[in-house]
């Protein structure tokens, strides 16, 4: 007996897609999946970050909606989840927070005033935002604007979601020779390193300079080393594990020092005490190890980010008229140093925070030109985004930069066409 004919109505675009499912180009569904942090569950990443269905972001006149292929993992997500030092909800007032300050993806929708980008463009995202309407944003340094903020940390619309919302001036061309996950892993740390070394004239890196790079195998340090080498300068990489020596030398460092061979770390002892005298002797022994690499030259720039544990030594080993530039205090914020070595030798202590678009674009050009490797250490799937942050929080991640997949279904995909093919669309 013949079966009755069943007429199936044509299916139109859906209003919620599975992660990795590709909507028609430019179709913005009403809802999306995201890893969400809420104020009432601040704590470790695997409790604070939960998958939820939330409304897809609307875009303003100068904003862009990006279909996220992969996202970078950094400490912004850990801090946001912990709610420390403050809850991001107290900054942006949104009831839910989506972390993520690095992304690669495809432009999916644009605001009415966006001219530089079109739907379908493959992009990477840098994380600086501002209102664009003050003197610093117009002729000055946008990083000094009172409205300056870090997307995905001080804003609620970061990259750990199917779609993220950004200002159009956050977008940069994606290096097509990289995979989606490699493209997502480097922008925050590379642009930060670039501003540290090139953004504080006259103390900008030059050929022949010597640069001391703390944490040389870490997500930030790998770019300090590579930028120095690519600029004709000499990087002295500081490590804490001899197994990382060859890795750092392979990035272009002139020499490597294991800080565990010395005992001059932590807050500086009180001046003119026996403890201080012992500290000075050990710090000078560390300086001698630097001289063995540089040919008895003090370093022009100290690339500093551990903070409390290393800052006293950093200010000691910088040359007369040199600079200690720092962007973080991962070992603590109570920085101590012997002021005599700073004022009498006229050294500069310079704080540095991320980068503006011109600096981020210059940093990205190093990658586009294949002069800088993103040093991606590992990639995890979408379902393990909270786990990735736990690994970072507990310092269980590998050297380099970590990424997570979002809509890219597997590692190794290098174009939107690859993603469409992998999805079976």
Language model: regions and residue ranges:
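Hydrophobic/small residue at the entry helix of a nucleotide-binding pocket
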Residues: 192, 219-220, 309
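Helix-to-beta-strand junctions that scaffold the AdoMet/dcAdoMet cofactor pocket
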Residues: 206, 318-319
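C-terminal hydrophobic helical "lid"/dimerization subdomain
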Residues: 2-30, 312-315, 357-425
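C-terminal substrate-binding/catalytic core of Rossmann-like NAD(P)-dependent dehydrogenases/reductases
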Residues: 270-292, 296, 333-379, 386-390, ...
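N-terminal Rossmann NAD(P)H-binding glycine-rich loop of SDR-like oxidoreductase domains
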Residues: 217, 225
């Amino acid at each position: 007996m013949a079966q009755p004919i069943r007429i199936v109505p044509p299916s139109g675009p859906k209003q919620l897609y599975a992660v990795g499912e590709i909507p028609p180009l430019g179709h913005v569904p009403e809802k999306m999946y995201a890893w969400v942090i809420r104020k009432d569950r601040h704590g470790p990443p695997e409790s604070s970050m939960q998958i939820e269905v939330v409304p897809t972001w609307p875009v303003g006149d100068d904003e862009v909606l990006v279909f996220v292929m992969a996202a970078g993992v950094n400490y912004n997500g850990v801090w946001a989840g912990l709610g420390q030092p403050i809850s991001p909800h107290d900054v942006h007032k949104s009831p839910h927070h989506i972390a993520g300050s690095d992304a690669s993806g495809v432009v999916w929708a644009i605001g009415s005033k966006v001219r530089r980008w079109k739907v379908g463009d493959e992009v990477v995202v840098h994380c600086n935002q501002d209102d664009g309407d003050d003197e610093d944003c117009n002729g000055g340094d946008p990083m000094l604007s009172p409205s300056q903020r870090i997307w995905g940390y001080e804003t609620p619309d970061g990259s750990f979601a199917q779609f993220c919302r950004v200002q159009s001036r956050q977008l940069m061309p994606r290096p097509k020779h990289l995979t989606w996950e490699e493209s997502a892993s480097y922008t925050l740390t590379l642009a930060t390193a670039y501003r540290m070394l090139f953004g504080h004239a006259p103390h900008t890196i030059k050929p022949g300079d010597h640069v001391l790079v703390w944490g040389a195998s870490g997500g930030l340090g790998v770019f300090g080393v590579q930028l120095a080498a690519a600029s004709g300068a000499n990087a002295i990489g500081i490590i804490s594990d001899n197994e990382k020596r060859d890795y750092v030398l392979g990035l272009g460092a002139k020499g490597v020092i294991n800080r565990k061979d010395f005992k001059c770390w932590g807050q500086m002892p009180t001046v003119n005490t026996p403890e201080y005298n012992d500290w000075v002797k050990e710090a000078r022994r560390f300086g001698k190890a630097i001289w063995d690499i540089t040919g008895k030259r003090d370093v022009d720039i100290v690339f500093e980010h551990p903070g409390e544990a290393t800052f006293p030594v950093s200010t000691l080993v910088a040359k007369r008229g040199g600079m200690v530039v720092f962007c973080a205090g991962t070992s603590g914020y109570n920085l101590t140093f012997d002021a005599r070595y700073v004022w009498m030798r006229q050294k500069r202590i310079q704080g540095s925070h991320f980068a503006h678009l011109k600096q981020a674009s210059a940093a990205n050009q190093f990658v586009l030109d294949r002069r800088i490797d993103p040093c991606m250490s590992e990639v995890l799937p979408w379902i393990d985004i909270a786990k990735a942050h736990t690994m970072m929080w507990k310092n269980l991640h590998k050297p380099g930069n970590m990424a997570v997949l979002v809509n890219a279904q597997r590692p190794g995909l290098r174009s939107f066409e690859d993603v469409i093919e992998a999805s079976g669309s």
